[in-house]
């Protein structure tokens, strides 16, 4: 078949869409007055002709750091905070669509957010848009520095925003499955969101207390929160067509389902295996990082986003006896021999070819950004899908020396799922 280039095609009129008649941001306030430490809940009632574009919806929060009794920080106080504050300040976010719970209950929302931010966004995004969400890159190999005046320049930059308990405002898209897909939420479907604040020792970083400078009792105080939902008014003819099709079928919204889980690697081991890490339909991709267990539970003096290698010398997955990756991760951090492992991560992320570059250098990856990625499903993970795999996954880790404390392995998995909505606008 002979093709013709667009600059020579004069006889076809441009396609004009008439389905979306109006587009705007709808401001939603919490259903109750915000109280320190209490969940922040939003209720969005479905309207028949208003479809919701969650992919372009934003959460805005205004907050400050102060003492638990409300006293403002004084000029000499130097209080650091976690990276990506818009998200790390919440332990979990519950989401309900059409009376169906579509999120898993856990306290790992900060880790999902930081994983997705570090792994998915190139430098151009991190240095611009993600600043609005509280992102400032921590200095590699300086994650243990909790004094904001120290060598971690990222921590120092963030600290300046909170001096004297000044109000700080962040805005960005929540890290929720349905907020990262392109289909609109149909009109008439109710949606509930519940943001659960994290405890202060997880969010706030401060130098260790001394006799001269005791540890202050601090809190994150949220003064306002708003949800800006991108709303699209749809033509009556399209609504009628949708409702007619609903009589014999359902709305189907495919999305990438992200699940978080943790494993505890005990003190005093050089080998760690875990059978049945995933069972049944296997995820398309898995990311793993190791964190000090005290940081995960919350500590003023430990950065929860320090992903250490702990002298790891072997890391791999067994899927029905098959090794993934075929050549397992076998870094030697004592001799700085880890470039192949770094490139394996880039390949699993899709940053090994083309113009997009990962923001993490090999040296940074080995010094606090040590995240490993496993691609389970062969082929592309975009619009064109390969068949999912089924079976079970075994995790194998080896360390050069015995672990000196408990380590938490944090895992993020990506799989495919579909949300269906029936004619009563209920999720099924």
What is each residue range found by the language model?
Residues 1-428:
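Short, low-complexity Pro/Thr/Gly
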């Amino acid at each position: 078949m002979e093709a013709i280039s667009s600059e020579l095609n004069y006889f076809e009129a441009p396609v004009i869409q008439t389905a979306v008649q109006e587009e705007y941001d709808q401001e939603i306030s919490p259903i109750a007055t915000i109280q320190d430490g209490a969940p922040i809940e939003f209720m969005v009632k479905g309207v028949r002709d208003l479809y919701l574009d969650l992919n372009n919806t934003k959460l805005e929060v205004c907050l400050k750091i102060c003492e638990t009794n409300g006293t403002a920080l004084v000029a000499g106080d130097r209080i650091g905070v976690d990276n990506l504050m818009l998200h790390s300040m919440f332990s979990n976010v519950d989401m309900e669509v059409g009376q169906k719970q579509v999120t898993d209950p856990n306290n790992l929302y900060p880790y999902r957010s930081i994983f997705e931010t570090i792994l998915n966004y190139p430098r151009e995004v991190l240095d611009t848009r993600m600043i609005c969400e509280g992102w400032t890159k921590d200095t590699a190999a300086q994650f243990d520095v909790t004094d904001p005046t120290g060598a971690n320049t990222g921590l120092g930059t963030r600290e300046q925003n909170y001096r004297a308990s000044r109000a700080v405002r962040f805005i960005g898209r929540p890290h929720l499955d349905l907020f990262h897909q392109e289909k609109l939420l149909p009109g008439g479907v109710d949606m509930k969101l519940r943001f659960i604040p994290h405890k202060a020792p997880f969010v706030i970083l401060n130098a260790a207390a001394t006799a001269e400078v005791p540890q202050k009792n601090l809190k994150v105080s949220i003064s306002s929160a708003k949800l800006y939902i991108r709303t699209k008014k749809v033509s009556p003819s399209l609504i009628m067509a949708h409702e007619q099709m609903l009589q014999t079928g359902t709305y189907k919204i495919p999305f990438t389902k992200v699940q978080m889980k943790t494993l505890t690697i005990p003190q005093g081991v050089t080998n760690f295996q875990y059978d049945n890490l995933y069972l049944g339909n296997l995820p398309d991709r898995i990311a793993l990082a190791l964190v000090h267990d005290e940081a995960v539970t919350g500590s003023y003096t430990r950065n929860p986003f320090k992903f250490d290698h702990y002298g790891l010398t072997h890391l791999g997955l067994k899927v029905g006896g098959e090794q993934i990756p075929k050549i397992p991760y076998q870094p030697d951090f004592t001799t700085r021999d880890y470039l192949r492992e770094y490139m394996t991560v880039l390949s699993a992320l899709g940053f090994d070819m083309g113009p997009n570059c990962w923001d993490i250098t090999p040296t940074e990856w080995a010094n606090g950004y040590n995240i490993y990625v496993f691609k389970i499903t062969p082929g592309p993970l975009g619009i064109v899908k390969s068949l999912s795999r089924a079976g079970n996954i075994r995790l194998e880790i080896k360390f050069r020396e015995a672990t000196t404390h408990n380590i938490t392995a944090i895992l993020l998995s990506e799989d495919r799922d579909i949300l269906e909505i029936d004619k009563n606008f209920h999720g099924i």
